[in-house]
Amino acid sequence: MVRFSEIARTEILKTLNSPQIPVGYALRIGLKGGACSASYLLGLDKATENDELYEVEGVKVLIDKRHLMYLIGVAIDYAETESGMGFTITKT
């Protein structure tokens, strides 16, 4: 389903366990837009009735049921460079 690099997993868990994040939140992976112009989204959120909740490598992951088939096989990484830091999502 979804794969995390070790550094991405570490950064996500560090964020989710931060005291500023409300209890019960999970990593939301989703899509914005459609067809050829869709882009991936990452965020922290509570589950809704439209979500599936998974635990992947110790990370609680929320995915809207409508997005499931499009997110199979995505890989999430994290990088720090001179120009900034952040997550990348690629489809493998």
Predicted regions span which residues?
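Short, thiol/selenol-centered motifs that function as redox-active sites or metal-ligating centers
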Residues: V2-S5, Q20-G24, G30-K46, N50
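Phosphate-interacting basic helix/loop segments used at nucleotide- and nucleic-acid interfaces
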Residues: I7-T15
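Residue-level signature of catalytic and energy-coupling elements of molecular machines
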Residues: I12, G58, I76
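Short, low-complexity, intrinsically disordered N-terminal segments
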Residues: K14-L27, E57
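Short linear motifs in intrinsically disordered
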Residues: N17-P19, L41-D45, H67-L68, D77-A79
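Short acidic-hydrophobic surface loop/beta-edge motif
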Residues: E52-V56
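C-terminal structural segments of small proteins and small subunits
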Residues: I63-T92
